[in-house]
């Protein structure tokens, strides 16, 4: 934005009755902040995308025919997503005194098969191809809008947001999931240790040493921390009962090791194609962007900038993130960010009420899906300030 336009707008917003010196100071600080913000964020994001190993097409144009029929799963997912957005929106407005949230993403209730959906779909694609993907929630300083009268269709208002949130939902209780997975890992390690001792402290150990010395060495040197690294091909022994017993134990060991290899962390899942669309919006509005994943008991957040830095370092792949073609996400290539490296910004969520709903399609087909109401999120204001507002 030209400095003259910024000065003109800032002069109009200067405190009434301020003396000339105070007014000039206020204006200079405002313009300086605007220039610094313009330089520091959107340019950094664009540079990170250019360095990204996935060849992101920042000029991508979205096209395609609109779907013609809705499905129960889609309607349930949409209801859950809308509920998650409300949890975040209300938790910020209920627990933050200096900042407030405004719903900004598309909130249309229309779905495939409804009258006018084709026009809606075309307009949505046009929006993606011009301004990019709208975040779901914008966060503003209360001091910038004391009456909270933000006009989300006013670009100057949108550019005053301090944070943009893309809200995702997950059908898990992360506490329960984490406990289950930790116990599964512990059981698998204990089983590996028991098999190791059973082999080494019996005649089967000498038999393995003679038959497959490299496997014997792997097992002998293994610890609880290194069982996951063991990799061997199961022998096809069957000539004696001892060899069959040894083969059975080795098979059980491989199965336990396979359990240790399973991905056991939940994730935040930005789609690969969304990177370009999120960037397009950032380049227009220059607002810090975050992904926030809502589970049914907690919510976690990570910045878009951290995601880009993470995937640009191949040492992080397999531990902190993975790249998968997700059949649950319309078969699109998805970045799965380990939620353990994200910040727990909502430390508790009360469960919502849920009930069945029905949608009748034109030809008389009935779709049954789940709706969600109520529940409450409890914002961790320290993390919100440190890892979101001041990040």
Segments from the language model and where they lie:
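Interdomain/boundary linker segments immediately adjacent to catalytic/signaling cores
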Residues: 2-133
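Non-catalytic C-terminal interaction segments of nucleic acid-processing enzymes
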Residues: 3-60, 72, 206, 213-391
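Conserved catalytic cores of phosphodiester-cleaving nucleases, focusing on short active-site segments
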Residues: 88, 92, 135-265
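Structural alpha-beta junctions
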Residues: 93-102, 192-194, 283-289
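A structural signal for short, well-ordered beta-strand segments and their strand-loop junctions
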Residues: 101-103, 164-166, 289-294
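Short, solvent-exposed loop/turn segments at secondary-structure junctions
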Residues: 109, 170-172, 296-299
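Catalytic micro-motifs at enzyme active sites that drive phosphoryl/nucleotidyl and oxygen chemistry
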Residues: 122-128, 148-155, 278-281
């Amino acid at each position: 934005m030209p400095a003259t336009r910024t000065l003109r707008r800032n002069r109009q917003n200067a405190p009434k009755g301020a003396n000339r010196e105070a007014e000039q100071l206020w204006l200079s600080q405002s313009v300086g902040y605007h220039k610094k913000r313009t330089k520091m964020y959107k340019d950094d994001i664009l540079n990170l995308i250019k360095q990204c190993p996935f060849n992101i097409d920042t000029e991508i144009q979205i096209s395609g025919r609109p779907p013609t029929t809705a499905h129960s799963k889609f309607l349930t997912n949409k209801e859950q997503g809308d509920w998650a957005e409300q949890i975040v929106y209300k938790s910020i407005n209920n627990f933050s005194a200096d900042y407030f949230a405004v719903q900004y993403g598309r909130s249309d209730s229309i779905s495939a098969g409804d009258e006018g959906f084709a026009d809606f779909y075309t307009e949505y694609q046009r929006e993606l191809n011009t301004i990019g993907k709208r975040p779901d929630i914008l966060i503003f300083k209360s001091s910038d809008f004391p009456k909270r009268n933000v006009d989300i269709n006013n670009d100057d208002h949108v550019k005053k947001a301090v944070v943009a949130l893309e809200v995702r939902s997950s059908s898990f209780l992360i506490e329960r999931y984490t406990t289950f997975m930790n116990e599964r890992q512990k059981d698998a390690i204990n089983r590996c240790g028991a098999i190791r001792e059973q082999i080494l402290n019996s005649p089967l150990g000498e038999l393995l040493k003679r038959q497959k010395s490299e496997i014997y060495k792997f097992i002998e040197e293994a610890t609880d921390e290194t069982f996951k690294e063991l990799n061997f091909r199961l022998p096809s022994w069957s000539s004696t009962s001892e060899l069959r017993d040894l083969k059975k134990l080795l098979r059980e060991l491989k199965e336990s090791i396979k359990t240790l290899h399973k991905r056991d962390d939940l994730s935040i899942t930005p789609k690969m194609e969304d990177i370009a669309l999120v960037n397009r919006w950032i380049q227009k509005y220059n607002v810090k962007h975050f992904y926030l994943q809502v589970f049914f008991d907690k919510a976690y957040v990570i910045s878009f900038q951290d995601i880009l830095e993470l995937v640009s370092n191949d040492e992080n792949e397999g531990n902190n993130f993975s790249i998968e073609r997700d059949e649950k996400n319309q078969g699109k290539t998805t970045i799965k960010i380990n939620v353990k490296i994200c910040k727990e910004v909502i430390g508790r969520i009360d469960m919502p009420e849920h009930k069945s709903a029905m949608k009748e399609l034109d030809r008389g087909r009935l779709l049954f899906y789940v709706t969600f109401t109520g529940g409450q999120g409890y914002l961790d204001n320290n993390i919100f300030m440190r890892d979101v507002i001041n990040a």
